[in-house]
C-alpha cells in the first residue's frame, strides 16, 4: 500500500445512482462494513508510518463482531501464518550455534566474516552467547537480559572482542557502522564488574567516553538493558543534573560502578575534585577517531592523566581508525590486540551508495524535488549538511514543500534534540535535517535513505554519516550531491565506494581522477568549501531585494549625514553668538 496515494485520494459522487442514493442514510450493514474498512485502513497507515517498529498494533485488522466468511477466512489465514512463523522459529532454534574450540575453527570463522585479528596470544572467538557460560561463567541475569531483548546471536565484532576483553587485554577495534560495537564493549565490562566481589561505594570501576551527548545517552540505554535486575551494579550517565549534584556534594561519585560521559563534562567534575578516576579498571573510548582528533585530543589526554590505576585496561572502538589514531592508541596501551572487521576504511556492504552531480547549489534542491517526484524519497530520511546556517536554510525550504521535516544542530538544547530524535524514531518526523552532530553512533534502525547534501570533509566522516542507514544487516541507500567546487573532496568518498564494492554508483570518468597529495587532503579536512546560500528565489527577485536594501541603507546614511551637518551648524552658531 502506497500511503502517499491514500492521503491524496479525493471523493466523487456516483451520478448513475441518482441523488437519493448518494445522500441516503447508510444501513446498519453498510455502517459496519465501512467501520471495518476504516479500521483496517488506519491499522495499515499506522504500520506503514511506524518506521522504527516502536508502536503496538492490533494483530487483526478486522474486529470479531461480524460473522461473515471473510472474517473467518481472515482469522484462519492469521492462524496459519502464525503457525508457519512458529515452525520456522522452532527450526531456527534447532540449529545449534557453532562451537569454536581450535585455532582452525577460529581461522575458518574469521575467513567467513572477513575478520582480521593481530597481536600476541589471541583468544579463540565465541560462537554464541551460550559459549560464555562455560568459558567465562557469564552472569545468568545478563544472559537472560540479552535473550529477552532479542540479542540471540553475537555479531562478528562481539564474537572477537568479548573474549579478548575478558582475558584482560587492551584492544583496538574497527568494525562497520551498525555492527554491534556498543554491546561488544558493554557485555565484558558488566561481566568483569559483576564477577568481582567488592564492597559497596568502592568507586568507579568502568568509564565510557563518547564525543556527543546523543551517543552517550544511547550507550547508557543499552547499559541499562543488560544490567536490568542486577542489584549489585550501579550505573549512571553524567548528565547536567548529576554533574550539578556531584559538584554540590549532594551525591558521591563512589556509589557508581560504571559512568558514561562526554569529555568536557567529566573533566569539569574531576577538576572540582568531585569524581575520583584512580580506581578505574576499564576505560572505553567510543568513536576513537573523533576523540583522538585535534578537537578532542587534549580533553582525552587530560582524562587519561587522571586514570592512574596501574592495572587499567583500555579499549578503543570506531567504524574508522586512521593510522595516526592507531599510533596514538599504541602509545597509551600495553601490547594491544587489533580487530578489523571487513575493510578498515569501507562502509557497510548493505548500503547502496551513489554520487550525483548537481552542477551548483540550486541543482541540489532540484535533485531532492526530482527524487520526490520519482518516488525515490522514501522516509525515514536523514539529510546531512556542513553547517548550522545551511541546515536551517534547507529546513525552511523543505517546510515550504510541505514535507514532514525537522532539524537538529548544536544550537538546539539537549532537551530539544532528545525530543526531535524521539519523534523521528516514532515516525512523527519523516525527514531529519542535521549537521555532523548526529553522524556518529546514534542508532536509527529503520532509516531508508541518507543524503549528503554537502560533501563530507573526510572518508571517515562519510563512513559515519552513511552509517545511519543499512544497520543490523538491513538494506539502505546513501546519495551524495556534489558540485564543481567538490571535484577534489569527492576523491576520498570514491575510494570508500570502491572498497565497499559500489562500482555502479559513480560515473566511469571518475576512475581517471588523480590521487590527492597530503597537502590537498589536509586542506579538504581543515577548510570548509564556501558555498552559496540555499535558496530557490529567482535571480530577478534577489536583485530587487538587494536594490531595496541598498536604498534603505542609503536613506539611513543620508539621515545620519544631515543630523551631523545640523549639529555642526548649531555648534558654529553658538560660537558666533559668544
From Swiss-Prot:
InterPro entries, from UniProt? DDX52/Rok1_DEADc (IPR044764), DEAD/DEAH_box_helicase_dom (IPR011545), DEAD_box_RNA_helicase (IPR050079), Helicase_ATP-bd (IPR014001), Helicase_C-like (IPR001650), P-loop_NTPase (IPR027417), RNA-helicase_DEAD-box_CS (IPR000629)
Q: What positions carry the motif DEAD box?
A: 286-289
**Region: Disordered, residue numbers:** 1-95, 517-578
SMART domains recorded: DEXDc (SM00487), HELICc (SM00490)
Biological process annotations from GO? maturation of SSU-rRNA
**Basic and acidic residues bias locations:** 44-53, 78-94, 517-531, 561-578
Query: Which annotated residues bind ATP?
Result: 175-182
Instruction: Return the broad EC class.
Output: hydrolase
Boundaries of each Helicase ATP-binding domain copy?
162-339
Report quaternary structure and partners: Interacts with the U3 snoRNA and is associated with the 90S and 40S pre-ribosomes.
Q: What is this protein called?
A: ATP-dependent RNA helicase CHR1
According to its UniProt entry, this protein's organism is Candida albicans (strain SC5314 / ATCC MYA-2876) (Yeast)
